[in-house]
Structures are given as C-alpha cells and as structure tokens.
Amino acid sequence: MAVPRWAVRDLTQISSARELSLRLEQARNDFRATVGSICYFNASARTPGQFDDEYIMTDQSLTYVYADGVTAQSCAMNRLLPSSSSNFGAAATAIPPWLLDPPRLNRLLREGTDEGGLVNYYEGPHKNAFFLAIMRSCIFVRPGADEINGVSYDFFARSGNYTEQAEEEEEEEEEEEEEEVLDREFQLGNLVSYPIIAWGSCPNSA
C-alpha cells in the first residue's frame, strides 16, 4: 500500500543511547503496522493515480542517513531523502547513531562518498551529527560494509535520485509535457520524496 499520513518521529530530545534504541525500534514496528508489509510511495509521472516501481519491504531493520541538523529537520518535515554523493545519490548505513563519535563516523562516511552531494561529509563531523531513520527501498544496493569491534555494518546506496531516470527518458524523446516533468525531477536530484520513519541527533554529538 502507499504511505498514509505517517507522523515522522522526532527523537531530537533523547540523549540516552538505550532510550533512543528502544524508541527507534518502536517507530520501526509502528511504521510496519501502519503501512503493511510492502510500501509504494512515489506517484507515477506517467499514470495518474498509480505508483512507480520503487517500493519498501517493511520486514527489515532500520538504516540511517546522516546529515547536519538543518538538512535533517527539513528532510524529516518534508519526507525527503538527501543526496550525499554525486555517483549514487543517497548513502545509508546500518551503523546506529549511538555507536560512534562524530569524527570516527565522519571518516567512515567519507570513505563511501564524494563531495558532490547535498550533504558533504568532507566539510566535517557536524555534517553527520543528526540522522534520518529509514527502511531501504528496492533500488538500494550494498556496495560494502564497515567492521566495528568485530561486527559488520552494511553500507548502502540509493542510485541516482531520479538523475539517471531523467537522462534515459530524455534520450527516448518523450512528449514535451513529460519532458518538462522529468526536467524538474532532474533539477531536484539532490532531494527525492521518501518515507522518513524518525529523525534525531546522535547522542555522542551532544
């Protein structure tokens, strides 16, 4: 089913790692109970009333997209996913927000991204002081993993943020009206409509 009016959980006032873990798990369970086992969320540009091919299977653990406070708040309020690299759009990781201090997390995030995204981790640890908790859609890929204290944490990437789709559709010379829609999507490539389950600040950033 499509995402109804899911209220993004604001966890910015929680400083305890244990409480944050519990609240995130509750948000994950509530999200699945609200939307069901499969979730379509982007309206089709071609077929009114239908959805595109991107979907989320909700029987999965949370993944985290890290950002600065202003970007995280804006994305949470508007249900948007920010890009963090020019080569594949949005980067996400299974590393939970309480596990590492900001400088160490920043070093790991820089290893999997470049300086071309809306969120540029190369500007410093403040760029990963907040998080967006999400579930991965079907177009996320797993390019690698990070090992921390003997535990492997997967690193994921969402390809393109509509940039590749827009280029392909232009090459196919679609009708003028459709091209205008795709042009707008191309210009908004650093942000893509996406279900955000919760957002907050990293306890070690306080």
Swiss-Prot record:
Gene: 6b
Keyword Transmembrane helix: no
Region annotated Disordered, chain positions: 162-182
Function statement: Involved in tumor formation and increases auxin and cytokinin effects in host plants.
Name of the protein: Protein 6b
Listed Acidic residues bias regions: 165-182
Keyword Nuclease set for record: no
Species whose genome carries this gene: Allorhizobium ampelinum (strain ATCC BAA-846 / DSM 112012 / S4)
Keywords: Crown gall tumor, Plasmid
